[in-house]
């Protein structure tokens, strides 16, 4: 049995994670679209950029809220380059959602917490966004609307999906991996792109979590680990899409 603690055993890997995140390349949105074959072959999926995670409520996080401006800029830039396919996935929970046993009650259906943030809802093309409320971390579980939408995009020629939102290790990870793994299972080529500038996760320090009787959540570590894991599975992870 190795008596060294995890921090010591994994020191080299943690250094690697630091270097990986610090060295993420910047990518050109225009070039991503061109490589896909044009804007008609690109779709953007916006995951949980809603009030209850970005602005107010039991699970709102200031660090998560910081992704709102770059996400709005990305959507505007994609629109200006001709991308018209945008889907919004939103936590919109039943009042007795089983998920509330793991996470404090949040983003209940019909509340302001479950609404898209104003910065995105106020975009000139927001009325064209496909809107998918969800009752679980993964929108691929419990109903077929999102998976049917994604499959429909592929059937219409979409080859590249850009995923942004929160949280890196939860809903964003589930969304990006579902797109990639579904394509793999069908023996199809699909490009999934995640810009670190437009994804984030929350932080709950150990001492605070212990006082609350909750599980701690190291935001910096888990953000880095899940960016790594997305890249490990073939998702293109970049620092930002300029």
Predicted regions and their residues:
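A short alpha/beta connector and helix-capping loop motif
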Residues: 40, 44, 57-93
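Generic enzyme active-site microenvironment
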Residues: 45-46, 50, 89, 195
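Short acidic, Gly/Ser-rich segments with clustered Asp/Glu that frequently serve as metal-coordination loops
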Residues: 49-57
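Short coil/turn segments at secondary-structure boundaries
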Residues: 58-65, 103-111
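Metal-dependent catalytic neighborhoods of phosphoester/phosphodiester hydrolases
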Residues: 97-101
């Amino acid at each position: 049995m190795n008596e060294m603690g995890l921090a010591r055993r994994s020191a080299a890997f943690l250094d690697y994670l630091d270097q990986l995140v610090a060295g993420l390349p910047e990518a050109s949105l225009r070039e991503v679209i061109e490589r896909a074959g044009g804007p008609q072959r690109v779709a953007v999926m916006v995951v949980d950029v809603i009030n209850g995670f970005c602005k107010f409520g039991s699970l709102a996080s200031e660090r998560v809220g910081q992704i709102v401006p770059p996400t709005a800029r990305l959507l505007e830039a994609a629109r200006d380059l001709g991308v018209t396919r945008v889907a919004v996935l939103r936590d919109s929970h039943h009042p007795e959602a089983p998920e509330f046993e793991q996470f404090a009650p949040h983003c209940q259906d019909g509340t302001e917490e479950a609404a898209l943030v104003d910065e995105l809802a106020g975009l000139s093309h927001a009325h064209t966004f496909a809107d998918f409320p969800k009752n679980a971390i993964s929108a691929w579980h419990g109903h077929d609307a999102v998976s049917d939408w994604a499959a429909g995009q592929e059937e219409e020629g979409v080859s590249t999906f850009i995923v942004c939102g929160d949280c890196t290790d939860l809903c964003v990870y589930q969304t990006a991996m579902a797109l990639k793994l579904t394509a793999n299972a069908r023996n199809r080529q699909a490009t999934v792109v995640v810009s670190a500038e437009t994804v984030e996760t929350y932080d709950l320090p150990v001492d605070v979590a212990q006082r609350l009787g909750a599980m701690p959540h190291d935001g910096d570590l888990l953000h880095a680990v899940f960016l790594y894991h997305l890249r490990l599975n073939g998702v293109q992870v970049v620092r930002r899409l300029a």
